[in-house]
Amino acid sequence: MAEIAGNLQRILQSLDRQFAGNKYLQEFERKTGFPKSYAIAGAGVAYLFIIFINVGGVGEILSNFLGFVLPCYYSLHAIKTTTTADDTELLTYWIVFAFFSVIEFWSKAILYWVPFYWFFKTIFLIFIALPQLGGASLIYHRVIAPLTDPYIAAGSQRKASGISSKMEQAAKGASARATGAASHQSSD
């Protein structure tokens, strides 16, 4: 329990540092005496609560909005980096997000069988979207890779063998032409 409290305290301190320059949060801190991180955490809890109670069906749009905006922010940063470490996590996230989008075609049936679906979906999307939690990597290695590797490996092998045979044919053709050209020059 002490470890959880310590982690929570570190997260709140990190939020205070990240939003140190925000004038609205500075005003909140000045007027209330509470740290900026409390306003951010409170807004986050209120957002999740609105999704949880799903007043007027707003849970769906709020869940999808958060599921798009947060990873989109990380994706825009990843595009500008030269490393590929974050790319796998983000691609995994977008694969799972797309899967949810297809499944939600039947959202009425899902909502009938899974109450609070939008809330659970939001929590899951946060888990796989935040790189600090490593959720996307976990989902990739435990679910996506075992399901897709047999098909992708087979396709890659066929493609590689197809490329190799084309290269061999081209090399033989070039060799035959070179031999023919050399024999043609020697007969001149």
UniProtKB/Swiss-Prot annotation:
Q: Which GO terms describe its molecular function?
A: membrane bending activity
Q: Which residues lie on this side of the membrane: Cytoplasmic?
A: 1-35, 79-88, 128-188
Domain characteristics, as noted in the entry? The short lumenal loops between transmembrane domains 1 and 2 and between transmembrane domains 3 and 4 may impart a wedge-like configuration, thus deforming membranes.
Q: How does it sit in the membrane?
A: Multi-pass membrane protein
- Disulphide bonds annotated for this chain are none
Q: Has the keyword Flavoprotein been applied to this entry?
A: no
How is this protein annotated for GO cellular component? cell division site; cortical endoplasmic reticulum; endoplasmic reticulum membrane; Golgi membrane; nuclear envelope
The record's note on quaternary structure and interaction partners says: Oligomer.
Its biological purpose is as follows: Required to generate and maintain the structure of the tubular endoplasmic reticulum network and the vacuole. Induces high curvature in membranes and causes membrane tubule formation. Involved in membrane/vesicle trafficking.
Stretches of Low complexity bias are at: 170-188
- Name a Pfam family for this protein: TB2_DP1_HVA22
Q: Under which name does UniProt file this protein? A: Protein YOP1
The organism that produces this protein has a lineage beginning with: Eukaryota, Fungi, Dikarya, Ascomycota, Saccharomycotina
Membrane-crossing ranges are 36-55, 58-78, 89-105, 109-127
The family annotation for this protein states:
Belongs to the DP1 family.
Intracellular or extracellular location(s) = Endoplasmic reticulum membrane; Golgi apparatus membrane
Q: Which domain of life does the UniProt lineage start with?
A: Eukaryota
> Keyword Endoplasmic reticulum on this protein?
yes
Q: Provide the membrane-side ranges marked Lumenal in the record.
A: 56-57, 106-108
Signal peptide per UniProt: none
- Keyword tags: Endoplasmic reticulum, Golgi apparatus, Membrane, Transmembrane, Transmembrane helix
One of its GO biological process terms is: ER-dependent peroxisome organization
